[in-house]
Amino acid sequence: MKKSENKKARFLTAVVASPEGEIFELDGYAAVGMAGKLRVPLSVEETLPLPYGTELLFLPDRNPIMYNLLTRKIETLVENPYRPGETIFPVAAFNSPGFIITYVSAYKEKRNSVQLPLFSYGAVGWHQKGFRSASICVDRERRQDLRLMPIQKVEAGIHRMQQRLPSNRLREHLENCAMMYGCPAAKNFFLGRYEAPLPTATTCNARCVGCISLQGEGNISNCQERIKFTPQPEEISALALEHIRNVKHAVLSFGQGCEGDPLLAADVIAPAIQSIRARTDKGTINMNTNGSRPEILEKLFNIGLDSVRVSMNSVRENCYKGYFRPRTYRFADVVESIDLAKRMGRFVSINYLNCPGFTDSPEEIHALISFLKSHPVDLIQWRNLNIDPIKYLRLMNKTSNHSRPIGIKMVLDKIKTQFPKLKYGYFNPPKETFYEMV
């Protein structure tokens, strides 16, 4: 990567990719981010150095949009302006965990463009000594910092667990997650750190457009394979108890990217929780879920479930249904699960899926503030929605009208002003820190 010669520029220098995937700068042009129909040149002041572990992606079948510093106009480039006839592609950042994007990489689709794979596509540019990302850090914990997950230690942990749990199918499944898919949650189990995943459910009662474990026929493939068996309660509890023994303030989470919804596997999860709690009161037992079955959730709370994280792309029913496409539950069931958890004194998070242009629309932020007043939660876990952003915005605009976005940073500030005790984060906290302010 060449260093930019324009060191005094307020704007980030635009970066593009060649057909071979080589990323380079375009002097004279500034990087642009987009949110809905809004196009914004990226500045140093509103971006961060590219977080460690972030991956850079180039976007096929698309033309980059950038800001011409000479004409002071937003332009769509169909070729390299310095090498006419040379094809160039937009570049996006798939940011590390804990960072949410404020703008999407700006581009225009070509005719008959293929849908983008299931990643988030943050805006990125170059300034002086490195790449910068249009993002905000919402969680500084190093739970999924790849620098703390050396492969030799992961392999050593796998060997130890093979000795400890030789015939445990769930342990075998997590080995595949760690080594085949590079899953940081699975790696943490074998490293004896933080949070252990407990994938259990083979089925789901939603058909999320951006489901990362099961996609129907089409051009998009799922990012990982859904678990193909239901672990026995004994397999679940044995693995969980190992993690509790190895980790101070351990977190155990049902509901992972490689499974359906855990509420549909309550027949094995309930006895597993009972078995864990019969042996120890240590460890935080958490469930990541769509919240579709409040009556089942209540039973799990009664036998030892400590916290719940409910996923939502929107608090507006039409927009929620447009993305989650629920099959056997209502939006009211999701809301009831949140209210139930608070009534029962449990720690409640919303897994709020972020896409600039929608999440920061006045309609969504107004609805979110109203929702939180009526249905309080303890934590918003901000996450980037892994989906083709233009396709997603088209889908959401079919469900509701959306005005000019106000910006993700302003969304965060507005909510914090309205609800000063509400926590922001990315990871499921242990019960020892449930009510510590950040």
Protein language model features and the residues they cover:
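Auxiliary Fe-S-binding modules of radical SAM enzymes
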Residues: 1-165, 366-438
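Short, flexible helix-coil linker/hinge segments at the edges of structured domains or between repeats
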Residues: 152-187, 212-239
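N-terminal pre-triad scaffold of radical SAM enzymes
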Residues: 181-215, 250-254
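Core AdoMet radical
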Residues: 195, 199, 216-272, 277-296, ...
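Active-site beta-loop-alpha junctions enriched in small/polar residues
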Residues: 257-259, 290-292, 313-315, 353-355, ...
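Alpha-helix-loop-beta-strand connector modules within alpha/beta enzyme cores
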Residues: 266-281, 332-346, 400-424
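Catalytic cores of alpha/beta
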Residues: 295-302, 357-374
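Conserved strand-turn element in the central/C-terminal portion of the radical SAM core barrel
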Residues: 325-327, 337-364
